[in-house]
Amino acid sequence: MAATGSGRSQFISSSGGNRSFSNSPLIENSDSNQIIVSEKKSWKNFFAYLGPGFLVSIAYIDPGNFETDLQAGAHYKYELLWIILVASCAALVIQSLAANLGVVTGKHLAEQCRAEYSKVPNFMLWVVAEIAVVACDIPEVIGTAFALNMLFSIPVWIGVLLTGLSTLILLALQKYGVRKLEFLIAFLVFTIAICFFVELHYSKPDPGEVLHGLFVPQLKGNGATGLAISLLGAMVMPHNLFLHSALVLSRKIPRSASGIKEACRFYLIESGLALMVAFLINVSVISVSGAVCNAPNLSPEDRANCEDLDLNKASFLLRNVVGKWSSKLFAIALLASGQSSTITGTYAGQYVMQGFLDLRLEPWLRNLLTRCLAIIPSLIVALIGGSAGAGKLIIIASMILSFELPFALVPLLKFTSCKTKMGSHVNPMAITALTWVIGGLIMGINIYYLVSSFIKLLIHSHMKLILVVFCGILGFAGIALYLAAIAYLVFRKNRVATSLLISRDSQNVETLPRQDIVNMQLPCRVSTSDVD
């Protein structure tokens, strides 16, 4: 048991466990930038919780989402809108669980994984999480390269190389206030959202068809399932679960049972508002693309653009709103989207590395490593396949994220449904059942598509029989390993109880926010013995 400097709050563990969390100080001296939640019960407290949900929602309107939305509308009109609705609802439930985990336990998801799993599973989960961060960064790289191409006519492959420099410059500007920087970027992103809302008025999509697409599930035509999975992967991202569970630790909240419950409730409302905005943006992008590309009076040039629509060609969709400036405005918003998503991705990567390995890097170095890994495949594809190939790589990256989601989602569901970790704030049975149904559907769709696509690939391949058999053995062995890894996470019992920060002597005791989360730099944290 270790006490803070004031002696008011204590870490109480119901079970020792064979692994411990890295120690995190409770800061006694708050600075002027801290967000402090009042002890008094009031709806005004909600404003103190605004922030994490909107930062997380940036990932829902990143270049990867724009790319998949544009292709979904161009190829299937409004038929895949229901995927956006389902994914947004699922994202709200899942993101709220991530926030609850951080609020209740004081530790984010990656730290919980390190405490719960042994070295080998923990290392593998870290590898998968890092791959997810890199896969998430690929659309940002390509989206930024497309934006530079539209703004300055820079070849896409050169733009790919320049993306590392542009993001490092933005990260260097953090010393002037990261909040101001992120709000500026978010403003630019929502500028393009307003344009799509206005374009929605000009394109006049049929309301009945839009509602039918939103509420009637259908997957017709070749490639619809793959695009649906990429839409799902672009909406519910594994790195967001790590990010959200960490960002909520930046608030100073009352540690009473009622204070924690209020924090969870307000974070749910905040996440709902943020994801509602992201949902409307994604629906408008699909609807505009569907209405414009399926119009009967489409010009031959626009029809050609729609047949192979990607971020580099999408500016013509805004022509009715801003005319000849459509390309420049879309490029600026695309650049803002890519850079803002990269910054939040950098934070997520920091928390992943710190949580799983207890290893911390400077933000610029962390971003450089991630960006280099994302640039390599992007550069190769841009050189070989041009902008069309780069656009297809965004879809592939989104599909990779969808396949990797179970390795972040299952631990989250297990932890938040565990009484020894969440105490009285454990998920109700109804929420537990709902979240497992959501997780099961996501995993089921992924597995079905993976197996069916692999079989189709083998059947239609022109390889010799011996090579088909060899590839089949390797492929199905990989699928079996994938299923076994998910099964291990699902059926393994939680063995480590969380150390909860609680109060023995007061219902109004507060804990100041985690210092490493507040300043977003992940400095070396002093042990609790140093705080005494």
From Swiss-Prot:
The chain crosses the membrane at residues 46-66, 79-99, 123-143, 151-171, 181-201, 229-249, 266-286, 329-349, 372-392, 393-413, 431-451, 466-486. Disruption phenotype: No visible phenotype under normal growth condition, but under Mn limitation, very slow growth and unable to take up Mn. It holds the Pfam family Nramp. GO terms for biological process: cadmium ion transmembrane transport; iron ion transmembrane transport; manganese ion homeostasis; manganese ion transmembrane transport. Induction: By Mn and Fe deficiency in roots. Residues 13-24 have a biased composition (Low complexity). It is a multi-pass membrane protein. Its main location: membrane. The keyword Cell membrane applies. It comes from the Eukaryota. GO terms for molecular function: cadmium ion transmembrane transporter activity; iron ion transmembrane transporter activity; manganese ion transmembrane transporter activity. Residues 1-25 are annotated as: Disordered. InterPro entries: NRAMP_fam (IPR001046). Keywords: Cell membrane, Ion transport, Iron, Iron transport, Membrane, Transmembrane, Transmembrane helix, Transport. Signal peptide: none annotated. It is found in: Cell membrane. The keyword Mitochondrion does not apply. Residues 1-12 have a biased composition (Polar residues). GO terms for cellular component: plasma membrane. High affinity manganese (Mn) transporter involved in Mn acquisition from the soil. Required for Mn uptake into the root in conditions of low Mn availability. Can transport iron (Fe), cadmium (Cd) and cobalt (Co). Belongs to the NRAMP (TC 2.A.55) family. This is Metal transporter Nramp1. It comes from Arabidopsis thaliana (Mouse-ear cress). The lineage of its organism: Eukaryota, Viridiplantae, Streptophyta, Embryophyta, Tracheophyta. The gene is NRAMP1.
